[in-house]
From Swiss-Prot:
It comes from the Bacteria. This is Histidine--tRNA ligase. It comes from Shewanella woodyi (strain ATCC 51908 / MS32). The keyword Nucleotide-binding applies. The keyword Aminoacyl-tRNA synthetase applies. Belongs to the class-II aminoacyl-tRNA synthetase family. It is found in: Cytoplasm. Its EC number is 6.1.1.21.
Length: 424
């Protein structure tokens, strides 16, 4: 026997037993963004490496350690996209979507990061995100947060997530704070871990995001960015909080919250949960007003968020919120005898035509009545249709209930669709 080929580490299959939960999640996402008037955008999986170096930042973990990068046959450096925002901006600039106009966009698809696989975090993962361009006011920051809150409500996890908010100010304010933070960190340079020492001069705000408890203890007295904000940045953040209060969205201001990507300014946020252990963040985002211009477009305000779907699926499973996921089959059609088999196929096709939303599976491969009923039960169908010689002779179909304690019924063939529509 030939050696079996396995999936690449950290890149997982979604099996038929798992896909109904994924489909439910994707449906909720699509319905929610539609309710807010957002339009879908789809971008290539492979992009120029320079796109991510210029947007994410060359001294970030993603660019330094995690990107899947390779040279194509022309010698161009290409990268499997590690996130969706940069690609959305690139497409918006390239096709003139962002020039002097507002855009509300959403995307969903696979992303790739070469990091250590663990529960809820994989090397290929599915990401959903929304991006708004051309609006620089706090009301649209509030809108994307309201949209995300609506997602939790529709998924039944509203009580299990918490919104954390912070503001990073504008680039000038952040530069002043950066200098103050470096000065503070230099006092403890020898006590910082290797990663924090490396970040101290290249990206000091990321030191605030450390998971090392010893470094966290050193940061208790670190300066807070909020103290370095100008009047305009303070007013923006204050108005955002006011809007969230008005619509009843609870939040916690976390002055240590920074984002792992260089392009954020002003509003940053994360939805976190205590139900997933160390991988507590389930959605994150913020404002990135300089990125469109940085990637060759006109100066354009922007705000958005992204969420990893694997982590949401894990949360739904952890909270045991998967019991209402329906099976993929409503009706299973069986046949006894060659003539009946032909008629059974015709009946199944007629049902699919007359009831477009009905999910009908036909038995294939032969077998006696017991075997066919076993397959029908395994399919998850609510009803099995039995077509035998007697039923054919009387122009009827036997309806057998698989999930309810009801007696089997004989239904006229020409009234079958109407009958089933009332039962399912």
């Amino acid at each position: 026997m030939a050696k079996q080929i396995q999936a690449i580490r950290g890149m997982n299959d979604i099996l038929p037993t798992q896909s109904p939960l994924w489909q439910k999640l994707e449906t909720v996402l699509r319905e929610t963004v539609a309710a807010y008037g957002y339009s879908e955008i789809r971008t290539p999986i492979v992009e120029s490496t320079d796109l991510f170096k210029r947007s994410i930042g060359e001294v970030t973990d993603i660019v330094e350690k995690e990107m899947y990068t390779f040279d194509d046959r022309n010698g161009d450096s290409l990268t499997l996209r590690p996130e969706g925002t940069a690609s959305t901006v690139r497409a918006g600039n390239e096709h003139g979507l962002l020039y002097n106009q507002e855009q509300r966009l959403w995307y969903m698809g696979p992303m790739f990061r070469h990091e250590r696989p663990q529960k809820g975090r994989y090397r290929q993962f599915n990401q959903f995100g929304v991006e708004v361009y051309g609006i620089g006011t706090a009301d649209v920051d509030a809108e994307v947060l309201m949209l995300s809150a609506r997602l939790w409500e529709k998924l039944g996890i509203k009580e299990h997530v918490t919104l954390e908010l912070n503001t990073l100010g504008d680039p000038a304010e952040r530069a002043t704070y950066r200098s103050a933070l470096i000065e503070f960190l230099e006092q403890f340079k020898e006590q910082l871990d290797e990663e924090s020492q490396r970040r101290m001069y290249t990206n000091p705000l990321r030191v605030l995001d450390t998971k090392n408890p010893e470094v966290q203890a050193l940061l208790v007295d670190a300066p807070e960015l909020m103290d370095f904000l100008g009047e305009e940045s303070r007013a923006h953040f204050s108005h955002l909080c006011e809007l969230l209060d008005a619509v009843g969205i609870q939040y916690v201001i976390n002055p240590r919250l920074v984002r792992g990507l260089d392009y954020y300014n002003r509003t940053v946020f994360e939805w976190v949960t205590s139900s997933l252990g160390s991988q507590g963040t389930v959605l994150a985002g913020g404002r990135y007003d300089g990125l469109v211009e940085q990637l060759g477009g006109k100066d354009t305000p922007a705000v958005g968020f992204a969420m990893g779907l694997e982590r949401i699926v894990l949360l739904l499973e952890t909270l045991e919120l998967t019991s209402d996921i329906p099976s993929t089959v409503d009706v299973y059609v069986t046949a006894m005898g060659d003539t009946s088999k032909i008629e059974a196929i015709k009946i199944a096709q007629t049902l699919r035509s007359e009831l477009p939303n009905l999910r009908v599976m036909s038995h294939c491969g032969g077998g006696n009545f017991k075997k066919q009923m076993k397959r029908a039960d395994k399919s998850g169908a609510q009803i099995a249709l039995v077509i035998g010689e007697d039923e054919l002779a009387n122009n009827q179909v036997a309806v057998k209930y698989l999930r309810e304690k009801k007696e089997q019924e004989l239904v006229a063939r020409d009234g079958l669709a109407t009958y089933i529509a009332k039962q399912i």
